[in-house]
């Protein structure tokens, strides 16, 4: 892998407090509570006990909402990425966002932003991902985050993606969803666990579960396609979501609404990595909806963006050229 270096032009850590003053408004706001500086490398074979000489490491700003914003920026959407970050690692993460010219707002925290370490095994094509715990955030920092979102609600979509940081209340995503709903703002959420469950009680526009997460939500096994559709319809009938984009991994994906249901097989591409495919899917769908496309075409864009991300090494995410090149290859079947 090619080594990339980027030196911050700002002093650390004092200027972290200054970034809070910069406010921008947009059509789309993404929120990431527990971002990570993604460090990636590769090796021929992963072995236990032995010292393994890796290739040069590369860095990218990571975190669910951060990655969605990076995709939206590349595709040309008016988007701001807001994220909690702190310490030297947080500054490096922020500087990478500025380097990519993504409109962003750092919500400063006291403790150090985490790193995420991934190793690509060349011999097998597998990715080994090591995720460190996030920093503890204070009640005041959580409240500052909520106030920022409340004061800078976007015009079209609020995208909440990724897990909550230690110290963040379980109902925080639910509070944000309730706030957005009060203003008629659609919420797109890609999360898991109790924080997701609480948000769904408020009713979101769209969320993207895996098959395992969907099974946990409905409380029973989902052995076949019919059961998947039934589970999605049950959640929609309970007004937990208007649209469910069900990720099926190598089997593709499914999109279900109250009166529509489609499935698409995964595109056959030369897979370099699976990292970032899910975030690219969300970014592709939201971008298409932002541009006024209907749900079917948004699904197609999501599938194309996800496949385009598989072509990249590390987490560069999808590139617009590949998204538009792959789009005609996406075949969607109505169910």
Segments from the language model and where they lie:
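Glycine-rich phosphate/adenosyl-contacting loop at the front of the ribokinase-like
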Residues: 1, 11, 16-82, 90-91, ...
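Conserved phosphate-binding/catalytic region of the ribokinase-like
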Residues: 197, 225-335
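Conserved phosphate/ATP/ADP-binding segment of small-molecule kinases
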Residues: 170-259
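Short, conserved phosphate/pyrophosphate- and ester-handling motifs at nucleotide-, phospho-/glycolipid
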Residues: 72, 210, 278
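Short, small-residue-enriched loops and turns at beta-alpha junctions
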Residues: 135-138, 164-168, 195-197, 253, ...
